């Protein structure tokens, strides 16, 4: 069967399942689950794949799923990936009343689109020049850190992000390249946003330690850890002129505990911060400056400081050839000039980690109103949110795996990874460290 007929058969199958795809997306939207807890959504994903005759591996990194559709011959393995988790947005009208979880980032659309693509590609089993992997990953949103640290302590996970766990567990060793889509809040029209950039980040959990004393009668006997924290915020702010504009450094700390009682000099003060940037080199440089500010501020007050570094996510660098293929199929579906290219999205995603290991794209899609992670986030065009991405991904897979997968082979051959799996894990393992400055009290 020629490529055009394969594409027509695929689109016919997706159109036949259009209402099912939308219903899946809407059902997941109404039942949001937070990272590493996405039991219901994971079950929906695996059940749907198995109904299509696609065998699944379940329980990866607690809730992840990996299904595989075999090709006609051994060849490249192309992955379509979706994220299972919701974000914490308790004011959203569809938020879970107990957890505050809401699909205010549109990950429900990803799962529906991957399953929709599977519905289009399943009838092509044995007709493609390689395999298709359908993956559902947990925990893209970097939230509930205490819960995730408890999982680390129990040995259930090592990384905070689901894709990082997939890498650690070796689940992606047989995958040659990956595609996924993501909502773009505020883009209501039918557009695909291609080859966009996202920053990487690292996290810090900080504890300033001082000495308690009565804040009214004998404050001079104490050492005020809150003063050390406040001074560190000022010191970090004065670093801004040292950051290059091209590096897009963002540092945004918060104080999570300012003391215990108002009439006691604070002796235990907690902070958290991210350090973001467009390259790991820039992030690590800025991180060292932040650490100097933290340690210097503690020293000047006579306090102690503990700094725990948390592996974050790497910057996203999308494969340009994959992006062009997706764009061609997007224009087939939406019309000419419907692609938006090269926007800077200064949030972060663990898709960046995968882009350092394999050819990968993370296409943003229109069909959404409101703001990301906010109570006004909503899907205003359900066909654009759920069905069009399914079609675009499936058509791109056909392009990649037609003719014994020659296009996919070429993309993989020309890709230069920033890390191997081993060096990637070694990088983050070396980074995971803590620092202590001062004696504390």
Predicted regions and their residues:
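Divalent metal-coordination and catalytic microenvironments
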Residues: 28, 67, 80, 107, ...
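Acidic/His- and Gly-rich active-site-bordering loop/insert found
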Residues: 3-104, 108-133, 138
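Beta-strand segments within the central parallel beta-sheet cores of soluble alpha/beta enzyme folds
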Residues: 23, 62, 80, 129-138, ...
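Histidine/acidic-residue-rich, glycine-tolerant segments that coordinate divalent metal ions
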Residues: 92-102, 108-109, 121, 126-252, ...
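Electropositive phosphate-/nucleotide-binding environments in soluble metabolic enzymes
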Residues: 4, 8-11, 15-22, 39, ...
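Non-cysteine beta-strand/loop elements that form the S-adenosyl-L-methionine
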Residues: 79-81, 204-209, 361-366
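Metal-dependent amide/peptide-bond hydrolase catalytic core
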Residues: 227-441
């Amino acid at each position: 069967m020629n490529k055009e007929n394969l594409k027509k058969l695929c689109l016919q199958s997706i159109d036949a399942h259009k209402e099912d795809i939308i219903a899946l997306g809407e059902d997941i939207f109404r039942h949001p689950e937070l990272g590493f807890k996405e039991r219901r959504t994971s079950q929906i994903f695996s059940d749907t794949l198995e109904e299509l005759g696609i065998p699944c591996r379940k329980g990866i990194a607690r809730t992840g799923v990996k299904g595989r559709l075999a090709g006609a011959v051994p060849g490249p393995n192309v992955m379509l990936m979706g994220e299972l988790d919701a974000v914490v947005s308790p004011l959203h009208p569809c938020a879970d009343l107990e957890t505050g979880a809401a699909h205010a980032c549109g990950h429900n659309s990803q799962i529906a689109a991957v399953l929709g693509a599977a519905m289009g590609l399943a009838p092509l089993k044995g007709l493609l020049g390689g395999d298709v992997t359908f993956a559902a990953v947990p925990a893209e949103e970097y939230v509930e850190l205490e819960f995730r640290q408890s999982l680390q302590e129990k040995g259930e996970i090592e990384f905070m992000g689901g894709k990082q766990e997939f890498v650690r567990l070796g689940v992606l060793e047989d995958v040659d390249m990956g595609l996924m889509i993501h909502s773009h809040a505020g883009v209501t029209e039918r557009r695909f946003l291609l080859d966009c950039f996202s920053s990487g980040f690292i996290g810090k959990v900080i504890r300033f330690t001082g000495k308690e004393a009565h804040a009214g009668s004998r404050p001079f006997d104490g050492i005020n850890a809150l003063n050390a924290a406040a001074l560190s915020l000022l010191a970090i702010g004065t670093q801004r002129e040292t950051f290059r504009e091209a590096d897009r450094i963002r540092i945004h700390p918060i104080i999570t505990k300012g003391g215990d009682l108002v009439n006691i000099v604070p002796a235990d003060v907690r902070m958290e911060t991210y350090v973001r940037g467009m390259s790991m080199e820039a992030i690590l440089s800025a991180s060292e400056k932040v650490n100097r500010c933290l340690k210097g501020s503690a020293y000047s007050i006579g306090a102690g400081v503990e700094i725990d570094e948390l592996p974050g996510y790497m910057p996203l660098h999308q494969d340009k050839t994959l992006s062009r293929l997706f764009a061609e199929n997007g224009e087939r579906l939406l019309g000419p000039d419907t692609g938006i290219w090269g926007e800077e999205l200064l949030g972060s995603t663990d898709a960046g980690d995968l882009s350092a290991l394999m050819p990968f794209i993370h296409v943003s899609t229109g069909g959404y109103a409101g703001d990301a992670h906010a109570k006004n986030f909503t899907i205003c065009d359900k066909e654009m949110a759920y069905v069009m991405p399914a079609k675009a991904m499936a058509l791109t897979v056909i392009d990649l795996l037609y003719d014994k997968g020659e296009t996919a082979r070429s993309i993989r051959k020309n890709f230069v990874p920033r890390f191997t799996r081993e060096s990637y894990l070694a990088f983050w393992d070396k980074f995971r460290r803590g620092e202590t400055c001062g004696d504390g009290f």
